C-alpha cells in the first residue's frame, strides 16, 4: 500500500479511498477482479512478452493502457485482449465502440456498433399484386 488520501468516512457499502497497491502478484484477487474505483495495482514484469501474458491472464478485458514509445506501444496494444486499449493517454471518444472482451461483456456501446446493438431489424416481404 503506497498512497491513500483522507476523504469523508463512508459507513456502508464496499468502497476504498484512492490507493496504489504495490508488490501485487497476478494471482491475487485484487489483480484478477474488475475493480471500479480509484485503485492502481502495480505488478512487475520481466519483459514485454511477460507483461502481455500478465495483462491477458484474467477473466476480464474491459480496458487496458499501454505507455511507451508510440510504435512499440501500438504493437503491444494489438496483443492485449481488451475491448479498449489506451495508448499513452486515457481519452474517451464517444464515436468509438466501447465494450469488453471475455467476461467483461459482449456487445458494444457507442459509435456505429453501439447503435447496431440497440437496433432491431425487420424484413418485410410483399408478394401481393395490386
Per-region residue spans from a language model:
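Conserved C-terminal structural/oligomerization subdomain of aldehyde/semialdehyde dehydrogenase
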Residues: 8, 15-130
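Short, solvent-exposed loop/turn elements at beta->coil junctions and helix N-caps
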Residues: 4-10
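A short linear hydrophobic-aromatic micro-motif
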Residues: 1-4, 86
